Amino acid sequence: MAFGDREVRRLLGKGINHYGLIENRDRIVVAVSGGKDSMLLLWLLRERLRRVPINYELVAVHVDPGFDTRIALELETFFKDEGFAYEIIRTDYGLRAHGPENRENPCFLCARLRRSALFKKARELGCSKIALGHNQDDMIETFFINICYGAQVAAMMPKQEFFGGEIAIIRPFALVSARNILKMCEDLGLPILPTSCPSASKTKRSEIRAMMEDLLRKNPKVRGNIYHAMSNVNLEYLPPTLPVRGKRGP
C-alpha cells in the first residue's frame, strides 16, 4: 500500500474520531456527485466498516442537476456493480440556476436546492447524517472566499447540525488533501466522472484555488498551517468590529 493511501486512511479515521462524526448505528447518506472526493469517501466509509468496532449504514445519494443524464446512469451502474445501496434524485436544478429567471449566483442557488433535496431524502430514508466529500483544500478555500468576498472570518465545519440536531452534515475528509484523494482514487481505479456544470471553472473558488496552488508550490506546509489557524484564533491581536455604515454610535 502506498504511503499516500495509508495517510488518507489515517487522516480519515483521525477526523472522524476527533470531530465525533460517526457513531454506532448511524444511518448515513453519502452525497455522491461522481467526482474524486465523493467517490473515494463512499468507498472508504464502507471499507472502514471492516476495521472499526462500530456498525453504521450507508446510502449513496446522487442529485442529478439535469445537465447530462449520462453521469447519473454511470453512477447507477457503479452503485449496482459494487453493491451499494443508492438513490438517484433527478432534478432540473442546474438548468434553473443558469436560466434567465434566476437573478442569484447560479452556484449559490444550485447548491441550496441540492442541499434541500439531500435533507428531504435523508428524512425519507431515516438517516440522521449526510456525509459530504469536502476535503481540507475545500475548507481552506472557503475560509479565504469568506474573507476576500464576504468580509468575514468563517469556513466549513467538520460537523454541522440542522433542524435542532435532527440531521447533521459531516465532512470526514476535513484533514485530507485533495492531492492525496486524487492519487488514491487513481491507485484504486475508481471512476472519476467529469463535471457537466458550465460554471465549474468560472467561480471565486477557482480563483482562490489558483492562489493556494502558488503558495503550496513555495511552501507545502502552508495548507496545514492555514487549517490549524482556523481553530487557533487570537482575538487579542485582531481589531475591534467597525461600526456598520449608516449607523451612528451612542
Feature-to-residue mapping (PLM):
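Alpha-helix boundary/capping detector
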Residues: 71, 105, 144, 148, ...
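Conserved active-site and cofactor/substrate-binding residues in soluble primary-metabolism enzymes
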Residues: 7, 113, 176, 203, ...
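The feature marks non-catalytic terminal segments
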Residues: 190-250
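Catalytic subdomain that performs nucleotidyl-dependent activation
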Residues: 58, 137-217
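Short, basic, helix/turn surface patches
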Residues: 111-123, 159-165, 212, 216-231
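Residue-level detector of flexible, active-site-proximal loop/helix-junction positions
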Residues: 65-67, 93-95, 160, 176, ...
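ATP-dependent adenylation/nucleotidyltransferase module used to activate substrates
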Residues: 1-143, 149, 179-187
